[in-house]
Amino acid sequence: MTAPTTRKDLMIVNMGPQHPSMHGVLRLIVTLDGEDVVDCEPILGYLHRGMEKIAENRTIIQYLPYVTRWDYLATMFTEAITINGPEQLGNIQVPKRASYIRVIMLELSRIASHLLWLGPFMADIGAQTPFFYIFRERELIYDLFEAATGMRMMHNFFRIGGVAADLPYGWIDKCLDFCDYFLTGVAEYQKLITRNPIFLERVEGVGIIGRDEALNWGLSGPMLRASGIEWDLRKVDHYESYDEFDWQVQWQREGDSLARYLVRIGEMTESIKIIQQALEGIPGGPYENLEMRRFDRLKDPEWNDFEYRFISKKPSPTFELSKQELYVRVEAPKGELGIFMIGDQSVFPWRWKIRPPGFINLQILPQLVKRMKLADIMTILGSIDIIMGEVDR
């Protein structure tokens, strides 16, 4: 009789590509020794659309509808970064009212993005209920977006020198009501999730990133702040009107999946604080640069004719990008979203390099999952928070 032999071969498993509503078209080739992860290789590129090359033969305004397809769950941020560059190159002043409207839209977009991170993250861990709860609040945010911009997603709302339209009548009151309601929703999430022993068992001490490690990998956003580094571009770069509001940077020391969860949950309440202050202190005046110039002019009949009201007003002025280099960045929900642009005395940029936070944060995944269990891969991947449109571009 032959003695039974135990196989020692490593097993290779394909995880993904998954449905776009979860982690998108990310494929992981995982090498397993039993339940333990030996190696993990992310395969990217399934959603590559050549966004950087498209930018090189479009004016900024023509390119705006494309940028909402990078991170399609936080489209206000991609629009903001696209128009911030030309504004700095051309030294274009943004009216105070427009800046406040931008801040409100950006923070609503941040909350919507974090909500759609929370639902699938909890579903990955095995908690199905929060997945349905988050859509309730997210729908209210999309209603606000639809009332202000005409679109639930892909808003195309930002313009060089301001925004496309003023806030409609009654919108501010509706938004304040949402803020009051949403704070109770966050408290409900805290009660349901944060102290849940099963949840804590799945995330505590899983996927730990040290302070130095986070810096060396170039991580940003909640991934960086969860590792004990108090770095938020809204405080560092002083862009838009963030200096005028009272709010705190959310950060944790532990660097594990639980810390990343706590940072994002904390950011939602801080965003509500910013929105409430902006809504209560929003100044009057023009909502875009063209309107501001109009107010400064004498009463001239040319401003009231058909062409101005229906044609000239809609696209922002197309101007040549001067021959210089510029790097602009904003604090997006997933981290530092940046653009390195080179002008060439043309209406088209000569080079348009995107720095997507999701792509850079994803690089640390193979190191985090090594020597972990197979079930921990989804916990760690979920805590990183990636959108493949932004990763592949």
Curated annotation (Swiss-Prot):
Fetch the Pfam families from UniProt. Complex1_49kDa
**One GO cellular component, as annotated:** chloroplast thylakoid membrane
Domain of life here? Eukaryota
Q: Where in the cell is it found?
A: Plastid, Chloroplast thylakoid membrane
The GO annotation for biological process reads: photosynthesis, light reaction
Is NADP a UniProt keyword of this protein? yes
InterPro entries reported in the protein's UniProt record: NADH_Q_OxRdtase_suD, NADH_UbQ_OxRdtase_49kDa_CS, NDH1_su_D/H, NiFe-Hase_large
Q: Which UniProt keywords apply?
A: Chloroplast, Membrane, NAD, NADP, Plastid, Plastoquinone, Quinone, Thylakoid, Translocase, Transport
What topology does it adopt in the membrane?
Peripheral membrane protein
Read off the PANTHER family from this record: NADH DEHYDROGENASE [UBIQUINONE] IRON-SULFUR PROTEIN 2, MITOCHONDRIAL, NADH-UBIQUINONE OXIDOREDUCTASE 49 KDA SUBUNIT
Question: Do you know which HAMAP family this protein is assigned to?
Answer: NDH1_NuoD
Its family remark reads: Belongs to the complex I 49 kDa subunit family.
What is the documented function of this protein? Answer: NDH shuttles electrons from NAD(P)H:plastoquinone, via FMN and iron-sulfur (Fe-S) centers, to quinones in the photosynthetic chain and possibly in a chloroplast respiratory chain. The immediate electron acceptor for the enzyme in this species is believed to be plastoquinone. Couples the redox reaction to proton translocation, and thus conserves the redox energy in a proton gradient.
Protein name listed in UniProt: NAD(P)H-quinone oxidoreductase subunit H, chloroplastic
Q: Which organism is it from?
A: Solanum bulbocastanum (Wild potato)
What would be the name of the gene that encodes this protein?
ndhH
